[in-house]
Amino acid sequence: MLSIDKHLPAPHGLAAVLVRRAPKLVLPFLARSRSRLRATLDDGREVAVVLPRGTVMRGGDVLVAEDGTLVEVQAAPEQVLRVTSDSRLALMRAAYHLGNRHTPVQVVADALQLEADPVLEDMLVRLGVTVTHVQAPFEPEAGAYGGGHRHGHDATFEEDYAAAQALYREHHGHSHDRGCDHSHSHSHDHDHDHGHVHGPGCGHAPHHRHD
């Protein structure tokens, strides 16, 4: 069994012919995100990988065994969700909700890709984007998986969705500016109150009452 303890992220500067001739370690993203594992190379040899904790192997990276053997990492095709939309705004909103859940996401041309998950798929459909199942290598953005891998299996989507809708209405419907056409009241429990916050163009005389 080969023991591997060195990881060379791409671009590693090794001669292309050496990498091309090297045996391949073909793994899905979940396995490539483990720093310790046993696996089988494409030539049938067994390997034990022991890398620094937190290491994520990417397609094109090279591993070096204790005996000097080079091994090229390849991202295995796996079941992923591909998210597309004719509306750039809808796709941006989908990316926001996925990021809010710390979901690993791969950004490709005009699409997002993520690990297959029925709950997240339902959320995305409700957001109005198109979701298709494809077999493809999965290479999420670096750091997207930091802080844990959390799916939307909770009630936070309803709150996030409402907040996103409210934000959209605020920017595309009614908005407040410095001219303050109407008043806002703010009550306080301390000894004085401010009935209105005055700004340029307000048109109201200042009033500040002390008891």
Curated annotation (Swiss-Prot):
Basic and acidic residues composition-biased segments: 176-196
GO BP annotations listed: protein folding; protein-containing complex assembly; urea metabolic process
Compartment(s) where it occurs, according to its Swiss-Prot or TrEMBL record: Cytoplasm
Keywords, sorted A to Z: Chaperone, Cytoplasm, Nickel, Nickel insertion
Gene3D superfamilies: Urease metallochaperone UreE, N-terminal domain, UreE, C-terminal domain
Cellular component terms per the entry's GO annotation: cytoplasm
Molecular function GO labels: nickel cation binding; unfolded protein binding
Stretches the record annotates as Disordered: 170-211
Superkingdom of the organism of origin: Bacteria
InterPro entries cross-referenced by the UniProt entry: UreE (IPR012406), UreE_C_dom (IPR007864), UreE_N (IPR004029), UreE_N_sf (IPR036118)
UniProt xrefs under SMART domains: UreE_N
Stated family: Belongs to the UreE family.
Annotated HAMAP family: UreE
Function: Involved in urease metallocenter assembly. Binds nickel. Probably functions as a nickel donor during metallocenter assembly.
Protein name according to UniProt: Urease accessory protein UreE
Species lineage: Bacteria, Pseudomonadati, Pseudomonadota, Betaproteobacteria, Burkholderiales
